[in-house]
Amino acid sequence: RDHGKKGIWKVTGNDVEVIPIDVAFPVLHGKFGEDGTIQGLFELAGIPYVGCDVLASAASMDKISTKIFADRIGVRQAAYVADTARDLSEKEETIAKVEEKLGYPVFVKPSNAGSSQGVSKAHNREELEKALALAKKHDHRVLIEETIIGREVECAVLGGQNPKASPVGEILAAAEFYDFDAKYNNAESKTVIDPDL
């Protein structure tokens, strides 16, 4: 490949056309869009893009990695247990750790999934077993976190050298927690911009 030609290479039979791209805006959501995959493709093709680089995207999309990084720099966060077994073979060991370290209720999340897909709230052992099975359908790495009672707020940070925070939004879920349905299918869920905190 000629590294001097940047862009998307369209190959049709023996014909090759390079389609130049000035800059890409990766507006993909979730897996392959926010996990470093598309960013890596842009870098391989020599296409400039906006947003986080490959490492930042991959590390921040993976909830367990994010917890480890946050812990290393002293960010306070919910206590957690990580289950990284490829299947449910270590389920009993995970449940024992959860019951010893966290208690109930807990949130169970696939480590690499977005939009709260595969996320459950477990109030007891039976619900935890079901939640682990559901989360493992989305990713073999599963994060189990203690429940923290409080108001849920969100804030985006934009920019690299001179980052700026967006206004804070408070999430008012129309369900017990802000799951996939509450986010995308329930019109009763709301986000209040600049709430009274």
Question: Where would I find each of the regions flagged by the language model?
Answer:
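Short hydrophobic/aromatic-enriched beta-strand-loop microsegments
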Residues: 48-52, 77, 165
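ATP-binding N-terminal substructure of ATP-dependent carboxylate-amine bond-forming enzymes
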Residues: 1-55, 59-65, 72, 83-96
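Short glycine-/acidic-enriched loop or helix-start segments at secondary-structure transitions
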Residues: 35-37, 117-118, 154
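Short connector loops/turns at beta-strand edges and beta->alpha or beta->beta junctions
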Residues: 47, 113, 183-185
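Phosphate-binding site of ATP-dependent enzymes
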Residues: 120-197
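Active-site nucleotide/adenylate-binding loops and adjacent lid/helix of ATP-dependent enzymes
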Residues: 14-18, 57-151
